[in-house]
Structure formats: C-alpha cells, structure tokens
Amino acid sequence: MNYQPTPEDRFTFGLWTVGWQGRDPFGDATRPALDPVEAVQRLAELGAYGVTFHDDDLIPFGSSDAEREAHVKRFRQALDATGMTVPMATTNLFTHPVFKDGAFTANDRDVRRYALRKTIRNIDLAVELGAKVYVAWGGREGAESGAAKDVRAALDRMKEAFDLLGEYVTSQGYDIRFAIEPKPNEPRGDILLPTIGHALAFIERLERPELYGVNPEVGHEQMAGLNFPHGIAQALWAGKLFHIDLNGQSGIKYDQDLRFGAGDLRAAFWLVDLLESAGWEGPRHFDFKPPRTEDIDGVWASAAGCMRNYLILKERAAAFRADPEVQEALRAARLDQLAEPTAADGLQALLADRTAYEDFDVDAAAARGMAFERLDQLAMDHLLGARG
C-alpha cells in the first residue's frame, strides 16, 4: 500500500497543533510562532485535506476589525491557492484570564454573555469559510472546590448557551452542527461533561438535539481510564459522532497529545478498524502537539507521522477483516449470533419457549469456550505485520 496521504483520505489538522510553540506549565516556548498561512501551505504539501482553527489561532485576540479582515483575507487566499478546506472551527474560551472560571458556566453573568457573543462571531466566520461542524470544548467549565460551583445551575446555563447557539444558527439558515468535546481532569480540577457518556446524556436535554453531537478525543477518554473505540462505537450507535480528534496517549495521566499511533497502539488499531468498517465519512482530524524537543522540521515529521500511522493501521485492519482464518475465528467466537435479535419472535414466544429457561442447560452453556484468545492473537499478528 502507498502510505503517502492524499486529500481523499480526509486528514485535517488544527492550526494550534503544528502551531504549538512548546510552552507548557513548566517551561517557555521552544519554537517560534508559526504563520497560519505557512501551516496551510506545508500541510497541503504533506497531503492533508484541510485545517481547523480557534478564532484566536487565526486572528490574535484583541485585533481591530481591519486587522481581523486582513488576517482572514490572507488565510482565505492560502486556502484557495492550496485547495485546502475548513471542515470545522471552534472558539477559544479558555486562554484569556477572563475565562478563569469558565465561559458558558462562569459564575459572572457578564462573562457568560461575552462568551456567547465571541462564539457567535466566530460561527459567522466558520460558515463563511465553509465549516460544517462547530466544536465546543468547555475546558474551563468546572471547579476545584465543592462550594464554588452549583453544578445543577451550571448545567442549566450550559443548556441555555447551547440552546441559544442552536437558535442562532437556525435563524441564520446556517448549515452547521455542534460537536461537544468531552475531557476530564484538566485544566480544571473537575470539568463538566468529562466523557462521551456525559455529553450524550446532556445533548438529549437540549431544545434541538439533532443539531448536537460529540467530538471525542483519543487521549481525553483514556485520561478517564476508558476504552476509546468503545466510546466511539456508542457515539456511532447513537448517530452522534459529528467529529473526531485523533492523537496518542499512554494511560491515565496528563493530556499528552502524542502523534496518532504513539502511546496505545492496540487502541489505535481498533479505532481505525471501527471507523473504516463503519464507513465513517467525516474528517480524520489530528489534535496533537509536536513534542517541545522538536524544531520546525520535527513538527512536520510529526504531522506526517500522524497520517502515515493511520494509513498503515487502515491497511492492517483491512487485512485482518479479509483474512479467511479471522472470519472463521469470528464465527467461532459467535459474533454472528450477537448480530441476531435475541427475541425477534416477541415476548410471548420467549415466555413460552422452554429451551430458553426450563430446559436450558446452564452447565453446558457455561462450559462453552469463546475462542477469544485465538481471535485476539490473529489481530495481534496482523497489527504486528506477521500476517497478511
């Protein structure tokens, strides 16, 4: 297989990823700022399909209207020259100190109103640039102490904010949907909507739930000790996977944002297998940080590695599914039975079926082996390149 990415692979990157300067809580930047236009050009050369942005990635915070217009014009020219797209955009509601207690759920009402206006302004730009998805990450929505936040009231304010944004895009006739990005543990001590499950439950309480889905990130679910492919499967099952952030993570620790494929390689394999077998048509969006050890050449090597690793895993997953021995092992593990309804004949037939209870041989059923180890080893063989 050719591991050279093309726009048909639909790989996208946030401007904040390749543009990260390496500044962290313990050290200053190790790289100079990256011009968004250069980011567009270099990513296009690598074979990417598009770029995404926070408002402040593209337009420095506090810019005048004239400065804003100039930044957008340069960016649009770069998009036109390279053929790159903007499938998604989002708002930075976490960097400026005004958001120290949150944005949509800040205790200060005037901060909440400012956060909504800031978001609405960038939604207009996102639609202008062709984005179909608007991501919302509530990184500062939470607390460090119990009395500091009335969580029920905060969820009311969160619902109010999303309902207002839904009203706005509907009134404007915008063809755009929202994707809530869950994350636990940082930067707030306890963050609202920390996992996929929290976000899915919240969405069902909104006035226009059809406008809202999730934007799960590999590292975020793993920070909570959860199985990311399982979370994605549930989001797909619910029809709520509107966007996805790909990166790498090594277990339950801080948000590492490694390049995709680094960290938990088995989880990355099963994730790619799931996305490809499910026919996921959205972008494969990389939200990672090139390590602060790298110079600018290392930034592009890291970005290229994200795409290459996805394509390698895509090839390995396809070989796994096409392997006749794997197909036989799947049947031995009775995956075909799992796809069958348990009681398609209805409740009354189930209650009348003596083989379902009275005559069911529980000891014989308990003695059946599931053959999962053989199946898993076949997957390992394909992942490690020993088969196919």
UniProtKB/Swiss-Prot annotation:
Coiled coil: none
Binding annotation for Mg(2+) 2: E217, H220, D255, D257
InterPro entries on file: Xyl_isomerase-like_sf, Xyl_isomerase-like_TIM-brl, XylA_actinobac, Xylose_isomerase
Active site: H54, D57
Enzyme kind, highest EC tier: isomerase
Pfam families: AP_endonuc_2
GO molecular-function terms, A-Z: magnesium ion binding; xylose isomerase activity
Top-level division of the source organism's lineage: Bacteria
Cofactor: Mg(2+)
Cofactor comment: Binds 2 magnesium ions per subunit.
UniProt GO BP: D-xylose metabolic process
Main subcellular localisation: cytoplasm
Subcellular compartments: Cytoplasm
UniProt family annotation: Belongs to the xylose isomerase family.
Listed name of the protein: Xylose isomerase
